[in-house]
């Protein structure tokens, strides 16, 4: 089972909604709620498609909804009559046993998981609880800690996207992960990542000097990300022209190499044929769609 993690923002949710529904037999999105004007509307899109997902209750970052916010605006509102989801709690170095106990005791009708973002001091206590999954972000917790937990509910998350400060700095290709190939041999029941966004989960961005298309290409043993960058890398003007430059590089690569083509790639092909710039948020959405399709294709 594949567990991609991302912010529940407009284009991230739209990427999920645009995927072939059959893929969700093997995919469980983990969503970090994010306040914006379409907050509830976006979650409702997943409800309307009956997509199973996991909601993170306690992502501690300024401006993000609190546990009470999520209770009031989602669990007791948009999700009041929806049962096809579960909850997860994100551990920090200062997470207390009382917090975990409160998480366990509340919303008793919903299954619950723990996301180990930082190592919890009372690991044995966590291991003894009846959680659906123990989800480990491997970049931040070590194997000795992971080994304290039983293997029949482990999910291994790796942040494979190597974010650069500037689009112009991306190499032509970078390794992403072999997690999809190795997780079972390490006793996992699932694996995941932060798609092509990365664990940094930036809240926004402005016009870039260079435009980049990040295209995942997954094979049996490893997934790579190809970075197609516009030829023009100076100034913030003409993002549409820069997108077409990057798209030309991408299509040329696809035409000459073996790449699985799903909805994401086919949409890029259509944009190339029409020489159309859909906007940078759509470029992001298509990159997420392709990433998930690529991973699903080799599972």
Go through each PLM region and give its residues.
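Hydrophobic, glycine-enriched assembly/anchoring segments
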Residues: 249-299
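Leucine-rich repeat
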Residues: 63-72, 120-128, 145
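Conserved, mostly hydrophobic/aromatic
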Residues: 16, 29
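Active-site-adjacent beta->alpha loops and helix N-cap segments on the catalytic face
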Residues: 37-41, 94-102, 120-126
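Catalytic beta/alpha-barrel core
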Residues: 3-7, 30-33, 52-59, 85-95, ...
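A broadly used, surface-exposed interaction patch
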Residues: 45-108
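Long, charge-rich C-terminal accessory regions
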Residues: 127-266
């Amino acid at each position: 089972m594949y567990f991609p993690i991302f912010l529940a923002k407009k284009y991230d949710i739209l990427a999920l909604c645009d995927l072939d529904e059959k893929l969700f037999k093997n995919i469980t999105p983990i969503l970090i709620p994010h306040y914006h004007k379409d907050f509830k509307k976006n979650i409702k899109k997943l409800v309307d498609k009956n997509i199973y997902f996991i909601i993170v209750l306690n992502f501690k970052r300024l401006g993000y909804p609190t546990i009470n916010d999520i209770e009031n605006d989602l669990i007791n509102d948009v999700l009041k009559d929806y049962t096809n989801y579960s909850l997860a709690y994100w551990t920090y170095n200062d997470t207390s046993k009382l917090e975990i106990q409160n998480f366990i005791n509340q919303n008793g009708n919903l299954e619950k998981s723990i996301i180990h973002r930082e190592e919890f001091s009372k690991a044995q206590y966590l291991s003894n609880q009846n959680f659906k999954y123990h989800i480990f972000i491997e970049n931040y917790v070590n194997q000795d800690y992971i080994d304290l937990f039983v293997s029949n509910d482990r999910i291994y998350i790796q942040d494979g996207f190597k974010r650069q400060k500037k689009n112009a700095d991306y190499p032509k290709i970078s390794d992403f992960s072999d997690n999809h190939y190795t997780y079972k041999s390490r006793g996992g029941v699932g694996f995941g990542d932060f798609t092509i966004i990365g664990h940094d989960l930036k809240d926004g961005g402005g016009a870039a000097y260079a435009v980049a298309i990040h295209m995942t290409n997954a094979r049996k043993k490893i997934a790579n990300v190809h970075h197609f960058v516009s030829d023009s890398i100076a100034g913030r003007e003409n993002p549409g022209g820069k997108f077409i430059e990057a798209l030309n590089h991408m299509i040329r690569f696809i035409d000459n190499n073996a790449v699985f083509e799903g909805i994401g790639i086919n949409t890029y092909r259509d944009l190339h044929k029409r020489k159309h710039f859909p906007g940078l948020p759509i470029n992001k959405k298509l990159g997420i769609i392709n990433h998930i399709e690529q991973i699903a294709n080799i599972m």
